[in-house]
Amino acid sequence: MEHYNYNGKEIIGIDHGFGNIKCRHVVFRSGVKAYDSEPAMTSDALFYEGKYYVIGEDHKGFVSDKSQDEDYYILTVAALAKELEFRHITECEAVLAVGLPIQWIGAQKEAFRKYLMRNELIEFRYHGQDYLVRIDDVQVFPQGFAGVVQRLGDFKGLNILADIGNGTMNTMLIKDGKPMSSRCYTDKLGVEQCIIRMSNELLAVSGFAMPYDVCEDFLRRGNADLAEKYTSVMRKAAEEYSDTILTKLREYEFNPEIMRLTVMGGGACILKHFWNDDGCRVQYIEDICATAKGYELLALNNLKRRDT
C-alpha cells in the first residue's frame, strides 16, 4: 500500500471537489447531511461531536469560498475516516495536504488553512471503529499543478493544462516543465455546467427531469442504455460543452499547432468521448485521485526542505 509517512506523520492528501472528495485511495461524493440519531437506512454514517453524518448521497453545490459553512470541514473528517480505514490506521499525527482553485489560492489560502486547523485533535467513529487524529499541519496548494507535479519533466516545449472538475476548470500554461504563474486561470466551467445544460435540454424533449446519476454516467462512459431520442440530446449537449471548453482554451491562446494539451479531472472523460480532437496532441489523465496524490508529494517535499 503506497502512502507517505514522514517522521511519524501521516501525509494525507484531500482534493475537496464540488462533485467528489478524493484521497489517494478513496473517492466519495461531496454531499453531507446531519442527523441527531443514527440513521436506520445506512451503515455508512460518520459519528462526530454528537451527530451522525451521512456522506456521499449527493453532490455539494458550487460555492466560491469552501470555508463559508461547515460542510467541507465535515467532509474532511469523512475523508480522514475513509482513507485511514483503508490504511488500517486508527490513531495518528497527520499533515493534511489540500488545495484550492488557482485563481482563489492567493485570497483564500490562509483562511482555508485556519478552517481546517481549528481543531488540533479530531475524534470520530466510523464503521464501529474509534479514531483519533492530531492535525500537525495543513498545507494548501494550487489545483491542477499538483496533479501533474510528478510528470512535469514530460512537459517539453509549450503545454496547456486543463483541470476540469465538477465546479471549475483550472487552466495553466507550462513551458519546458515550468508553470507560468502569469498564465493561470479559473473558470466556472466544471462538469456540472454540462449536466445542467443536458438536463434542461432533456426536460424540453421528455417533459421530465433525467436523474443526475444517469447524466453523470453517460458522460463518464460515453453512452447509456436509453432510447436514442434521449442519448442524441445528451450527446449533443456534451459536444457543445466540449466546444465551450475549447473556445475558452483558445481565449487563453491555446494553439494546437505549437502546444500540447493535457486534460485531467472528472471532465477529461467528456472531452475524450465527445470532442473531435482533429489530430491535436492531447493526453488525458484519467486518474481522478492524481491531484490528491500530488498534494501529498508536494507536502512531503516541503517537510523535507524544512529539515535541511
Regions from the language model: what does each represent?
Residues 1-161, 178-193, 212-308:
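Nucleotide/phosphate-binding catalytic cleft detector across ATP-hydrolyzing
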Residues 202-205:
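Acidic, metal/cofactor-coordinating or nucleic-acid-engaging core segments within structured domains
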Residues 164-170:
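Ser/Thr-glycine-rich phosphate-binding loops at phosphate-binding pockets of nucleotides
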Residues 23, 171-173:
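Conserved blade-register residue in beta-propeller folds
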